[in-house]
Amino acid sequence: MKKIKFYCVTNKLINFIKFEEYNLAWVGKNNSPTGYIRCDYNDNIFYKEKNYSELTFHYWYWKNLLSLEKDDQWIGFCQKRRYWIKNNTKDSINKENINKYLLTNLSDEQNKFDSLICDSIKISGAKNIKLLKRGWRNILKEPRILFNDKYQNIKVHFDMHHGYGNLEKAIKLLDKDDRDDFYEYVKVNNYFNPHIMFISKKKIIKRWFETLFPWLERCEKEFGFKTLNGYDTTRIYAYLSERFLSYWFKKYTNYKEHPWRFLDV
């Protein structure tokens, strides 16, 4: 069994996790509670938290803490409402019983992989009225979206919920090694691995962040900050990262999907 060092990103007090493997990382506007890791000093993007969400801490971790980790240490990221849980968990999970089910280490079998990413979610199957309301421009180009779930892919879903054409604009700003492959990925898949959560080791995490954040900086020149508003686009940089993570870890690592649960806190 291999222990995992977790970083749980939150803007609310979390007082129900009992395991020392879980380090609480603060991204809230108020002063951080005692014992929480702050990410508003040294090399940081704390002023972008509104638009970057949990990536605010991820960036700080990359710049200030990752180099201090041991090469063979398993490192995981979660967030205040979403947690990794043990395999084969069937019970309903709440604050009172979550410590019984929280993932704290990897089995010998899981240790053979390079990374763990969240079990995927399917994003096709929207009702036709919603497709017509939010996806009409996509339907004009591909009418089969209305009749076949296969065509309700990641790109269509992003266009509907986070601004038509925004994902394609962002993909054009990727390095050539990923540009075509990621575009193909979002066109042929109608599921992705959500929440910008992963478990891996130092070498891969470093490579991931070295790819992700320079791309997001280029995206900032396209989308900026002032015009981002509402659910659709305020956190567009997090939404882009969420889709890109699914593609990147599958392309560059020997990955395994793992269960997670939403916790209403």
Where are these regions (language model features)?
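ER/Golgi luminal nucleotide-sugar-dependent glycosyltransferases, focusing on the catalytic module
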Residues: 1-265
